[in-house]
């Protein structure tokens, strides 16, 4: 199976600050330093040795890094299947706008699906990302990162899949800054299967380890298999 990904990435001023604070307060989730910052603003800055390496204070939007993924699947039994994946990512984004890395990356991973019942599955994957000559904070960037995810999938109706999963990946940067360290997230959402070649994913990701990833991510993906 061949799959292509062409992301569109936008960094914009906040517009959900108040609802996000209310959501965390209602569920008793940690607010961290969120309430002490101005609302509905964007500031992404990084300085090292008195040199400013990243300084984004306005909205940015562009095509991200395009990637191609190739998979081979083996059915172990009528309940279990394992697939092996390889991916190459090309630097089509703009690293100065943080919509790309400026480097060509390779990733290898394996994935497993286990059927619990006709409409319920456990799934997981684990792999390794290899990157060289990354132009985003190149002096502290690591050449590899490991990633693992596991979750459960439920299909209440034929074209609809609901999912909940945990995701973790090791740090891509060699630094003591918390935001650039290992990441742990909880993601929930669903998939609408249009046909055998097309499907749409909608997901929301919440940071489990506060301060290492954005408070919340909204993801919309359209997959086309060839």
PLM feature spans:
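Transmembrane beta-barrel domains of Gram-negative outer membranes and organellar outer membranes
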Residues: 1-132, 139-226
């Amino acid at each position: 199976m061949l799959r292509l990904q062409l992301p569109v990435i936008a960094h914009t001023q906040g517009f959900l600050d108040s609802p996000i604070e209310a959501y965390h307060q209602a569920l008793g989730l940690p607010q961290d330093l969120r309430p002490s910052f101005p609302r509905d603003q964007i500031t992404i800055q990084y300085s090292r040795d008195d040199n400013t390496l990243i300084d984004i204070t306005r909205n940015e939007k562009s095509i991200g890094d395009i990637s191609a993924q190739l998979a081979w699947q083996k059915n172990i039994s009528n309940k279990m299947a394992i697939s092996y994946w390889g991916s190459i990512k090309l630097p089509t984004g703009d690293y100065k706008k943080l919509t790309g890395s400026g480097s060509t990356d390779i990733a290898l991973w394996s994935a497993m699906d286990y059927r619990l019942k006709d409409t319920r599955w456990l799934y997981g994957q684990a792999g390794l990302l290899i990157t060289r000559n990354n132009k985003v904070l190149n002096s502290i960037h690591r050449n590899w990162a490991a990633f693992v995810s596991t979750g459960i999938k439920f299909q209440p109706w034929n074209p609809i899949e609901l999912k909940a999963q945990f995701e973790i990946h090791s740090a891509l940067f060699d630094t003591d800054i918390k935001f650039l360290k290992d990441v742990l997230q909880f993601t929930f959402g669903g998939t609408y299967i249009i046909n055998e070649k097309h499907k749409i994913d909608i997901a929301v990701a919440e940071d489990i380890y506060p301060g290492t990833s954005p408070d919340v991510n909204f993801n919309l993906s359209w997959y086309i298999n060839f």
